């Protein structure tokens, strides 16, 4: 249900402005000795830094979880903005999925999440300013705890990404 809720929030609480939410959790530990099973993929969690807008970034996990990330997701979190010059819904439907693009200066951040507990492919069109650019999308890996990297050489702006159950993806377009 966590992924379904996450895919509903951009269309309800977050539709007209900032909201209070503390996403982007990679570990299964809430605190020392207390575990909670994360129901989404790590790429879904990474995407929430873009999909949700709260006025300032506040990630909810322990420092160890972020320090143990592979370099590309770690760099993504270092660069993701808290203030946006432009935001747009690229594709989605409440509780099903959401793909959001947000611009800070000349840099676009893309985040997409699935609210369904099944494998799927999501298709969307990039903002006009992003068409023709090459970049790497951080996607679901072999299981919910792994990332993969999808180089994109875009020509027409149409993107298709395969997702794991409760999956997601994120990317930076310069």
Model-derived regions, located:
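A common structural junction motif
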Residues: 128-133, 141
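A glycine-rich phosphate-binding loop feature that marks nucleotide/adenosyl-phosphate handling sites
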Residues: 64-73
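Glycan-recognition surfaces
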Residues: 1-64, 92
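C-terminal beta-strand-rich structural cap/linker in extracellular carbohydrate-active enzymes
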Residues: 151-174
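Solvent-exposed beta-strand/loop surfaces of large extracellular or lumenal domains
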Residues: 137-156
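Carbohydrate-binding surface patches
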Residues: 93-130, 169-170
């Amino acid at each position: 249900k966590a992924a379904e809720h996450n895919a509903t929030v951009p269309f309800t609480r977050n539709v007209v402005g900032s909201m209070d939410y503390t996403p982007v959790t990679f570990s299964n530990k809430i605190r020392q000795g207390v575990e909670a099973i994360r129901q989404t993929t790590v790429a879904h969690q990474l995407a929430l830094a873009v999909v949700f807008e709260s006025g300032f970034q506040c990630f909810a996990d322990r420092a160890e979880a972020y320090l143990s990330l592979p370099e590309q997701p770690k760099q993504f979190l270092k660069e993701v903005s808290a203030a946006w010059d432009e935001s747009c819904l690229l594709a989605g439907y409440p509780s099903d999925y959401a793909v959001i693009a947000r611009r800070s200066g000349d840099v676009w951040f893309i985040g997409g999440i699935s609210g369904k507990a099944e494998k799927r492919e999501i298709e969307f069109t990039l903002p006009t300013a992003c068409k023709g650019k090459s970049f790497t999308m951080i996607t679901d890996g072999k299981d919910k705890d792994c990332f993969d990297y999808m180089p994109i050489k875009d020509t027409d702006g149409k993107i298709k990404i395969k997702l794991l159950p409760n999956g997601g993806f994120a990317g930076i377009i310069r």
